[in-house]
C-alpha cells in the first residue's frame, strides 16, 4: 500500500554555516523587528550586568572600602535597579511576544515556499516519495523553526554581550584570575562542538523515522477497508509496532547524546567555580582583591556560567531548528524537472489536433523504453481508443500530453505548437482528464465540481451537474450541492464520484479529453449512467480513451492497439476484427454476457 521508496534526498548533510545562509533571506524580511528584538535583548542584559556591580558597591562600602555606606546610597541604588527592572520587564514582553510572532511569520513563509515548490514537482517525485515523509517536512520539521528564528540571533547576541562584558569587568578585578577562569572555555567549546554534532545526527534520524511512521499510519488508516476485508489487523499492528520501536530506539539514543552534552557542561561549570574558589580565595587571603570585588567576581562568573548554560540548553533547540531548515532545504533543492521554458508562451486556442513525432519515453529510474519512436496524428474532434495489455504504455502515452512526464526524445504538438514551448498552465487548461480512481477533495459537492473552474457561479455548477447526469442523485442527498462528501469522497459511491468528476470537466470545457479507464471499476448500472455522461462530454472534443472493456469503444473513430513494440495495430473496430490480429484475439476473449 505504501510507496516503494522513501526518496530522502538529504543523504548529504549541509554544514551549519550553509544552512544559516539558506535561512538568512527569510530572517532579512523582518530585519526591523529583529533589530528591535536585539535592542530589547541588550536592555535585559544590562540588568544582569549591573546587579553584581551594585552588590560590590554595597559590600565594599559596608566593610569600609570606598564610599561610606548610607541609607541614601542604598535607596539610590535600589531606585536605579527598580527602574532597570521596569525596563527589563517591558523589553522581555516584547521579546516573548513580538519576537516569537516574527518566528511564526518566518515559519509560515518557509512552509508557503515549500508547498509552492512541491506543487511544481512532477509525478516521478511523488511516485518515489512517501506522503507521510512529505507531510512531516512541511509541518513538524518547520515547527521548531519558530523557536530557532526567534531565539538563535537573540541568544547568541545576549551571550556575546554578557561574555565580553564579564571578561572586561573581571579583568579589571583580577587579570590572572580571569585568564584562569576563561582557560576552561576553549576546551568546553571543543567538547560541545563534538557532542553537538552527535545530537544533530540523532535529531535527523528522529525526523526521518517519524516520517516513516507517519507513512505507516497513513497507509493503515486510509486502507482500513482493505485491512478489515483481509482481517489483517494483526499484521498492521506488527508493522506499526516495528516502526514505533525503531522510533523509540532512535529517540532513546538521542536522549543519551543529550545527557552526555548536558553532563559535560555541568562538569565545566564546576571546574570554573573551583577555579574561582581556589584562586579567588587565595587572592583574598593575600590582599590581592577586596571582599566586595570577590562577591562581584563570583556573581559575574555566575552570570558567565548561566550564559554558557543557556547557550548549552539552547543547543538542543538550535539543532532541532537546524534539522528543520536542512530538511526544508532538501525539498527546495529537489529540481523541478518539468517547468515552463524561458521563452514559453500561452497555448493558442485551437480545435485540438494532436501530433506525436518519433516520441520515445523511459522513466528516469528505469532505462527500458516504455514508448519507442511513436508517431501519431489525432484529428481535431476525433475519438481515439487505446487498448492493449497492461504495461503497454497506454496511460504513459496519455500522461505525456499534459506533460505529467517529459518525453525522452521526439516531440508532441497541439494545433501545431510544441507542448514544451507553451506554458504548463495554458496547456493543462486545454485538457480535461477523467480517471478510473477519482479523487474528490474534502468539501462539498459544489466545491468539488467548481474545481474545474475556480470562481464558477452556482448556476454554472448546476448546469455542469445536469450535463454530467449527476443532478438527480445530488438533489437526493441530504444537503444537495452543499453535502459534505467526506475525505476523498468516501460518502459517495464510485458512480457518483465519477459523475462529479465528469461535471468538473464539463465546467472546465476543454477541447481535449483524456478518459483513463473511467468506467472499468463500476457496476453495470453505474457504467451505463457514466457512459452516457461521457458520450455527452466527448461530443465535439478530441478524445483519447484508455479502455479495458472493448464493448465501450466499438463506435470510436479509431482504435490503437499498443504492445511492447509500440503501436501494433490501428483502425476501426470492424477493420481490426477483419485483420484477425491482436485486437481480434482480445475481442474473442470477452465473455458472451459482456455485450458482444
What do the PLM-derived regions correspond to, one by one?
Residues 34-94, 171-176, 287-291:
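Transmembrane helix-loop-helix hairpins at lipid-water interfaces of multipass membrane proteins
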Residues 38, 42-53, 82-93, 145-148, ...:
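Hydrophobic alpha-helical transmembrane bundles that constitute the permease/transmembrane domains
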Residues 64-66, 70-72, 76-79, 169-183, ...:
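Helix-loop-helix
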Residues 32, 123-124, 140-149, 153, ...:
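An intracellular "coupling" helix at the cytosolic face of ABC transporter transmembrane type-1 domains
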Residues 2-13, 104, 112-142, 215-239, ...:
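Short intracellular "coupling" helices and adjacent cytoplasmic loop segments at the cytosolic face
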Residues 19, 27, 95, 99-103, ...:
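Juxtamembrane loop-to-helix connectors within ABC transporter transmembrane domains
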Residues 347-596:
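ABC-type nucleotide-binding domain
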Residues 29, 33-46, 81, 154-205, ...:
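Transmembrane helices of ABC transporter permease
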Amino acid at each position: 500500500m505504501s510507496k516503494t521508496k522513501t526518496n530522502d534526498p538529504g543523504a548529504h548533510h549541509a554544514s551549519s554555516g550553509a544552512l544559516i545562509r539558506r535561512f538568512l533571506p527569510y530572517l532579512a524580511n523582518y530585519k526591523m523587528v529583529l533589530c528591535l528584538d536585539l535592542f530589547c535583548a541588550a536592555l535585559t542584559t544590562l540588568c544582569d550586568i549591573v546587579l553584581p556591580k551594585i552588590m560590590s558597591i554595597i559590600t565594599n562600602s559596608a566593610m569600609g572600602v570606598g564610599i561610606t555606606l548610607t541609607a541614601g546610597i542604598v535607596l539610590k541604588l535600589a531606585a536605579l535597579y527598580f527602574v532597570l527592572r521596569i525596563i527589563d520587564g517591558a523589553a522581555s514582553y516584547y521579546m516573548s511576544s513580538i519576537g516569537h510572532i516574527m518566528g511564526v511569520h518566518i515559519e509560515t513563509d518557509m512552509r508557503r515556499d515549500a508547498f509552492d515548490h512541491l506543487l511544481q514537482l512532477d509525478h516521478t517525485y511523488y511516485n518515489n516519495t512517501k506522503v507521510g515523509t512529505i507531510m512531516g517536512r512541511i509541518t513538524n520539521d518547520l515547527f521548531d523553526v519558530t523557536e530557532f528564528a526567534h531565539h538563535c540571533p537573540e541568544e547568541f547576541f545576549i551571550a556575546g554581550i554578557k561574555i565580553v562584558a564579564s571578561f572586561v569587568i573581571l579583568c579589571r578585578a583580577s587579570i590572572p584570575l580571569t585568564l584562569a577562569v576563561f582557560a576552561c572555555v576553549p576546551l568546553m567549546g571543543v567538547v560541545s562542538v563534538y557532542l553537538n554534532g552527535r545530537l544533530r545526527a540523532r535529531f535527523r534520524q528522529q525526523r526521518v523515522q517519524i516520517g516513516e511512521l507517519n507513512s505507516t499510519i497513513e497507509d493503515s488508516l486510509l486502507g482500513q477497508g482493505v485491512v478489515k476485508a483481509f482481517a489483517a489487523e494483526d499484521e498492521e499492528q506488527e508493522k506499526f509496532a516495528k516502526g514505533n520501536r525503531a522510533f523509540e530506539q532512535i529517540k532513546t539514543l538521542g536522549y543519551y547524546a543529550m545527557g552526555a552534552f548536558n553532563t559535560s557542561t555541568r562538569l565545566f561549570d564546576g571546574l570554573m567555580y573551583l577555579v574561582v574558589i581556589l584562586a579567588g580565595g587565595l587572592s583574598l587571603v593575600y590582599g590581592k582583591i577586596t571582599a566586595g570585588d570577590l562577591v562581584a567576581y563570583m556573581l559575574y562568573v555566575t552570570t558567565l556560567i548561566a550564559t554558557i548554560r543557556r547557550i548549552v540548553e539552547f543547543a538542543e533547540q538550535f539543532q532541532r531548528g537546524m534539522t528543520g531548515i536542512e530538511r526544508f532545504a532538501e525539498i527546495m533543492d529537489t529540481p523541478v524537472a518539468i517547468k515552463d521554458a524561458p521563452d514559453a508562451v500561452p497555448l493558442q486556442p485551437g480545435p485540438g489536433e494532436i501530433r506525436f513525432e518519433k516520441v520515445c519515453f523511459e522513466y528516469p529510474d528505469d532505462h527500458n523504453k516504455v514508448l519507442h519512436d511513436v508517431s501519431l496524428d489525432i484529428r481535431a474532434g476525433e475519438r481515439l481508443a487505446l487498448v492493449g495489455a497492461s504495461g503497454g504504455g497506454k496511460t504513459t502515452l496519455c500522461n505525456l500530453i499534459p506533460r505529467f512526464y517529459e518525453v525522452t526524445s521526439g516531440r508532441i504538438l497541439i494545433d501545431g505548437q510544441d507542448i514544451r514551448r507553451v506554458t504548463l498552465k495554458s496547456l493543462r487548461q486545454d485538457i480535461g482528464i477523467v480517471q478510473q480512481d477519482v479523487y474528490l477533495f474534502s468539501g462539498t459537492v459544489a466545491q468539488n465540481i467548481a474545481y474545474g473552474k475556480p470562481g464558477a457561479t452556482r448556476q454554472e455548477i448546476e448546469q455542469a451537474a445536469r450535463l454530467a447526469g449527476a443532478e438527480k442523485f445530488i438533489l437526493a442527498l441530504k444537503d444537495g450541492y452543499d453535502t459534505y462528501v467526506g475525505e476523498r469522497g468516501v460518502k459517495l459511491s464510485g458512480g457518483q464520484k465519477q459523475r462529479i468528476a465528469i461535471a468538473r470537466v464539463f465546467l472546465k470545457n476543454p477541447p481535449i479529453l483524456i478518459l483513463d479507464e473511467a468506467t472499468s471499476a463500476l457496476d453495470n448500472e453505474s457504467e451505463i449512467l457514466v457512459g452516457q455522461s461521457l458520450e455527452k462530454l466527448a461530443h465535439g472534443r478530441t478524445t483519447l480513451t484508455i479502455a479495458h472493456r472493448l464493448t465501450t469503444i466499438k463506435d470510436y473513430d479509431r482504435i490503437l492497439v499498443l504492445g511492447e513494440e509500440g503501436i501494433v495495430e490501428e483502425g476501426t473496430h470492424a477493420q481490426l476484427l477483419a485483420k484477425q490480429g491482436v485486437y481480434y484475439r482480445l475481442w474473442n476473449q470477452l465473455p458472451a454476457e459482456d455485450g458482444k
